[in-house]
């Protein structure tokens, strides 16, 4: 089955690579229209997936990721339309010039070819990834989690209908609908057909891909994100940022999971934090120093376990640790962070600059929420993933991250001396 999918995707990629920006945008507009026109089919399939997942004991955080509503589906369709408005990087001349030999040389952006994406209970990823791949002239093979099997099948069927109506092969966007995990290992060895693989899931999936894949892998998406409250932070303003970073949508990878509080501000900051977190329904997991103060406040508080500093809660839970200074905060982030998104709240711009320079994450913020790490917020459109590695792409992966380049030399029967 996968062999045939690979062949179809590779053949489709050749046709996609030749499309003009106008032709690609026409396809995307058709997909957006069909997602809305056939929304009832997708929502009914999703309702079945959610019901099965709940019956199987899936946690609330994952159920939130899985669930579609009419508003969410419309938002997904609107995101596709936003991709139409983005500049097409394919064909862009990055640099070039004329060599001493007279050869005119240029470096031009081109599609990667076929992208493989493995992800869990995130039905929006199906459309986000497909739209970005089509915009950049890439075919894509999707492998969603078993929890989204019906939703993904319905969504991809709608996308393929739109492709066919535009004269393009269905092989441009395909989904593996068999939940057999053995197919993941088989997919990881499809280097004959797949040019880049993006896993969007937990640490176990990332480890499997690194160990077994014969395809270049872009890893990321695991977000143990930190906010450091410096001693000069404005408490009221800092709390607004923390509430946003923790509670706006707790199930996302850019949600803060650990709060590091400078010891010199702890006495005044922690009581205010407790009050705010109680109102927001957040459970605090505090170290010994913070626990003594937080236990007298209104927020629910428990003693933090050492391993929780490495946890991506994806829920209304927040670690709180008192640190001695900026050095202590940076050391903690280096030990427990996932190089996703980390922030400092401070009025001391020297400390802010040190934090930016010394915290080696894909996104680092000064006096801002970690929730900004998102393709849409960055002006990149829908994102295919958030890369936490350093090669090829880093941070939210927009259109350029789905391209490579080729060198093109144009001569007049020019030969090398």
Swiss-Prot record:
EC assignment: 1.2.1.41
Gene Ontology CC annotation, any one: cytoplasm
Function in brief: Catalyzes the NADPH-dependent reduction of L-glutamate 5-phosphate into L-glutamate 5-semialdehyde and phosphate. The product spontaneously undergoes cyclization to form 1-pyrroline-5-carboxylate.
Keyword Translocase: no
Protein name: Gamma-glutamyl phosphate reductase
Disulfide bonds: none
Provenance organism: Shigella dysenteriae serotype 1 (strain Sd197)
Reactions it catalyzes: L-glutamate 5-semialdehyde + phosphate + NADP(+) = L-glutamyl 5-phosphate + NADPH + H(+)
InterPro entries recorded: Ald_DH/histidinol_DH, Ald_DH_C, Ald_DH_N, Aldehyde_DH_dom, G-glutamylP_reductase_CS, Glu-5-SA_DH, GPR_dom
The family this protein is said to belong to: Belongs to the gamma-glutamyl phosphate reductase family.
Keyword Cell wall biogenesis/degradation: no
One Gene Ontology term of the molecular function aspect: glutamate-5-semialdehyde dehydrogenase activity
Originating gene: proA
UniProt main location, coarse: cytoplasm
Annotated compartments: Cytoplasm
Swiss-Prot/TrEMBL keywords: Amino-acid biosynthesis, Cytoplasm, NADP, Oxidoreductase, Proline biosynthesis
Pathway(s) where this gene product acts: Amino-acid biosynthesis; L-proline biosynthesis; L-glutamate 5-semialdehyde from L-glutamate: step 2/2
Biological process terms in GO annotation: L-proline biosynthetic process
């Amino acid at each position: 089955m996968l062999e045939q999918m690979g062949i179809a995707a590779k053949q489709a990629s050749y046709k996609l690579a030749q499309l003009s920006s106008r032709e690609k945008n026409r396809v995307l507009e058709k997909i957006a229209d069909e997602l809305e026109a056939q929304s009832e089919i997708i929502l009914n399939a999703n309702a079945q997936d959610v019901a099965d997942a709940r019956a199987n004991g899936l946690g609330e955080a994952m159920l939130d990721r899985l669930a579609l509503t009419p508003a969410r589906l419309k938002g997904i369709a609107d995101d596709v339309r936003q991709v139409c408005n983005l500049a097409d990087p394919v064909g862009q001349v990055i640099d070039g010039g004329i060599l001493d030999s007279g050869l005119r040389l240029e470096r031009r952006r081109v599609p990667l070819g076929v992208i493989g994406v493995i992800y869990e209970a995130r039905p929006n990823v199906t459309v986000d990834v497909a739209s970005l791949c089509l915009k950049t002239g890439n075919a894509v093979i999707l492998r969603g989690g078993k929890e989204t099997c019906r939703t993904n099948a319905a969504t991809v069927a709608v996308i393929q209908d739109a492709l066919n109506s535009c004269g393009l092969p269905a092989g441009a966007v395909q989904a593996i609908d068999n939940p057999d995990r053995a197919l993941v290992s088989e997919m990881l060895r499809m280097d004959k057909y797949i040019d880049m693989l993006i896993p969007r899931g937990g640490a176990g999936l990332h480890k499997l891909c690194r160990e077994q894949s014969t395809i270049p892998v872009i890893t990321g998406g695991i977000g143990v994100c930190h906010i450091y409250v410096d001693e000069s932070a404005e408490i009221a303003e800092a709390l607004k940022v923390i509430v946003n970073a923790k509670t706006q949508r707790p199930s996302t990878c850019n949600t803060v999971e650990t709060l590091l509080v400078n010891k010199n501000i702890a006495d005044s900051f922690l009581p205010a934090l407790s009050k705010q977190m109680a109102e927001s329904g957040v459970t605090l997991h505090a170290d010994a120093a913070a626990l003594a103060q937080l236990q007298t406040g209104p927020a629910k508080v428990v003693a933090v376990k050492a391993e929780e500093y490495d946890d991506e809660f994806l829920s209304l839970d927040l670690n709180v640790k008192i640190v001695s200074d900026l050095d202590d905060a940076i050391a903690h982030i280096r030990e427990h962070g996932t190089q996703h998104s980390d922030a400092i709240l401070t009025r001391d711009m020297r400390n802010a600059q040190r934090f930016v320079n010394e915290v080696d994450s894909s996104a680092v913020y000064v006096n801002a929420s970690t929730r900004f790490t998102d393709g849409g917020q960055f002006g990149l459109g829908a994102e295919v993933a958030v890369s936490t590695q350093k090669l090829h792409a880093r941070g939210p992966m927009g259109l350029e991250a789905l391209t490579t380049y080729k060198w093109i030399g144009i001569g007049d029967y020019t030969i090398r001396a």
